[in-house]
A protein has these predicted regions:
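Amphipathic alpha-helical assembly/interaction segments
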Residues: 1-151
Length: 151
């Protein structure tokens, strides 16, 4: 579990999971389901809003995550930023998988939960593939074009 702050994002997944576990012990099933859906919706917002905009002229990425707006300056250690973005999504995938399996369906049969979970993870895979394609295109635009200019 890692924290990432280089890209202007600070995620501490372990802390989030600990908080979720503590809340979970005190909650009724209805409250837990409501809390789980809110947590997932928030994280889905974080991911879907991460489609953002790349400004070639200014060499920066702008995006909204939840209620926060970030500008990531790509000048300088550019590769570090892209790595940090990719790593942050791995953390979100792990967090959402946990939330979905344990909070959303506490009284479901294992079979039903597996089926729902599979569907959810397929959705997450589609979203994360889109994200990786996006960060890959940033890599090509920023780094490959630099090599061409230098060569």
């Amino acid at each position: 579990m890692s924290s990432i702050s280089k890209a202007g994002i600070f995620i501490d997944v372990k802390q989030l999971l600990d908080f979720t576990y503590r809340m979970n012990k005190e909650m009724s099933v209805a409250d837990r389901r409501d809390y789980g859906s809110q947590l997932i919706k928030y994280n889905l917002d974080m991911i879907t809003n991460f489609t953002m905009a790349y400004h070639r002229r200014d060499e920066k990425i702008c995006f909204d995550a939840g209620d926060k707006h970030y500008d990531i300056n790509l000048k300088g250690e550019k590769r570090v930023y892209v790595d940090a973005l990719e790593a942050s999504f791995d953390n979100y995938m792990a967090l959402m998988e946990f939330c979905f399996a344990t909070l959303m369906f506490p009284r479901m049969t294992t079979r039903k939960r597996r089926r729902r979970h599979k569907h959810f993870m397929e959705l997450m895979a589609k979203i994360s593939t889109g994200i990786m394609k996006w960060s890959g295109s940033i890599y090509k635009q920023v780094f490959v074009s630099e090599r061409r200019e230098a060569g």
